[in-house]
Amino acid sequence: MRTAALLAVPALMLAGCSKADRDAAGGEGEGVPVGATAEEYQAALGDMEPVELTYQVSASSAESSSGQREEAFADAVEEMSGGAITLDIVYGNAVVPPDEISSALADGRLDLAHWLTSYHADEMKAFTNLQDALVSVETSPLQGEIVSHFTAQEVAFNTPEIMEEFDAHGMTVLNPYNTFGSTALACTSEKGSPADFDGDQIRANAAAQSQQIDALGGSTVTLQLAETYEGLQRNVLQCTFGSPTSMVMSGWLETAGNVYMPKDSSFVSGPGSIVAGSSWDGLPLAAQQLIYDQIVAYNTGELGNAFVSAIAAAQASTESGGSGMHFLDSESEEALKAGNQRILDAVAESENLDGQQLLTDVEESAAKWADIAEELGYTDEGDYLDFADWYAGNGDVMDPEYVGPIVDRFY
């Protein structure tokens, strides 16, 4: 039964010799056992010529909060392999623009990449259904972030139609769904009811966000990420969707310091995926396994980045003279929930997969991860505006002592 398989993820997905077994079948040479040490990996890679893999990411620099997770991933790969595998991180999509990443992975200009999956809704229709299905997950600074993070990855890996879409692009998936944190709405003025959104031009970065904008009473604008800062400054835009990471990194909060999150549901996210291209099949099996195994470091940094960025966004939004980071008012929340229900109804009727099963999978996975988070002590003690006061982590992006227990449960 598919639901039973879902609840066992990623154990079933990664069963066998290593977490890499699912997609590493094409690799040559001997693999390593589960829990292999650095010494075992290095022995297995002893006959491999050192290799440098070009890894393009959207983070602006190594020093940025999102860049720190990339550096941690690369460092873990190099250390575990004894220098046999290194990742050359290219920041800011400097090799190719986002719409050329797929072809660059295919022709070898890139080996690994952060692919902006949400930009390809026409090609990734089942994936887009998952984006939309996740609006049913409740939002909160700590537990909600954890639940949405692992629910998205778990369901993506367990939905054959989604994995087939990556396969059709010649991609091997390392991390199917990452968002830089839950999606928020940053506005140039305070919003206390749906009437305050009336006539606002709101930038969307995912297809179904237009339905959420309609529900709130605004009008949808499509604008490139790089143009959003100026759009807010010139009042072409009154609000924009985005992750707290993007808001801080792009300076949007200087002008749009009134940030809103839903509570009983979610805004549609604009995620990306960590994928490998055509060169993957040329790596020895042990090398593939090693890279897969070190995605744990990436996930640790992804969660840490989400927490740190939420704190930074709350602080930056008040420092800019805005009202800070809040949950939507109750009337706007109800309007959004009505819009989200229309999104969920469309998922249920999807022609791309069994939409009703997808909704069930998301519901069950979210409940599972909420229970696990509760069990491990990840509970919300306040809201976004005072998150810095009650967050129990050390405030660093890479905080394995705090984030490690929940990441380890996934793997």
Feature locations, PLM:
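C-terminal motif of bacterial Sec signal peptides marking the signal peptidase cleavage site
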Residues: 12-16
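Bilobed "Venus flytrap"/periplasmic-binding protein-like clamshell domains
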Residues: 47, 51-85, 167-238, 244, ...
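Contiguous mixed-secondary-structure segments that line small-molecule binding/active-site clefts
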Residues: 31-41, 106, 117-201, 205-216, ...
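Pocket-flanking alpha-helical
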Residues: 67, 90-133, 184-188, 240-256
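Bacterial N-terminal signal peptides that target proteins for export
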Residues: 1-5
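Bacterial signal peptide processing site
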Residues: 17-21
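Extracytoplasmic "Venus flytrap"
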Residues: 26-71, 92-96, 246-247
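Pocket-lining segment of extracytoplasmic ligand-binding domains
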Residues: 219-326
